[in-house]
Design a protein with these regions (language model features):
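Catalytic-loop region of hydrolases
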Residues: 1-84, 97, 105
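Cap/lid segment of the alpha/beta-hydrolase catalytic domain
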Residues: 92-144
Length: 144
C-alpha cells in the first residue's frame, strides 16, 4: 500500500489539463451555489528556464441576476502536483484576484514552486479600492 501512495505523491497534470481546459464551459449543476455556470477565459503556460512549470487558468462564474457582477477566478496548476492546494486572498471586501505567483504574504514560501495548486477569486465584484462596498447594493453580489 505504501508503494502505491508514494507513486501517487506527485501527479503530472499540465499536459492533460492544457488541452482539456481551453474554452471549457462549466455547467451550472457542477457548482454548489446557484449560478448560470461559468467558463474558462484563458489557459496560459508559464515556464521557467525553458521548461513548463505550471498552467495559469482564468475564468468567470456567471451570476443568475444579470445586474450582478460575475465572479472572476484564477488557478495555477503545477507541472508536478503534490496533491495539495492553497487558496490565497479572499479577505475584507476583496474586489480583485490576488497575486498567486511568487511568495506568500510575509513569507518567502512560494506554493506553486512546491507543487501546490494555488487559487484565488474576486468574490464576485471587481474594484480597485479594497474598501469599496458598492457591490453590496446587489443581493447576489452581497451573498457571493
Amino acid at each position: 500500500m505504501k508503494e502505491k501512495i508514494s507513486l501517487l505523491k506527485r501527479v503530472s497534470i499540465v499536459d492533460d489539463a492544457r488541452s482539456i481546459l481551453r474554452d471549457m464551459v462549466i455547467p451550472p449543476e457542477l457548482l454548489k451555489e446557484k449560478t448560470n455556470g461559468g467558463r474558462i477565459t484563458s489557459v496560459c503556460e508559464k515556464s521557467k528556464e525553458g521548461r513548463t512549470t505550471y498552467l495559469e487558468v482564468t475564468g468567470v462564474i456567471d451570476p443568475v441576476d444579470s445586474t450582478a457582477p460575475y465572479i472572476g477566478w484564477k488557478i495555477l496548476l503545477p507541472g508536478q502536483w503534490n496533491l495539495r492546494s492553497v487558496q490565497i486572498g479572499g479577505g475584507a471586501n476583496n474586489g480583485m484576484i490576488p497575486s498567486l505567483e511568487g511568495a506568500m504574504l510575509m513569507s518567502d514560501y512560494c506554493p506553486i514552486e512546491h507543487g501546490y495548486v494555488v487559487f484565488g477569486d474576486d468574490s464576485g465584484h471587481q474594484s480597485a479600492d479594497p474598501m469599496s462596498a458598492d457591490f453590496a447594493a446587489n443581493e447576489e453580489a452581497l451573498q457571493n
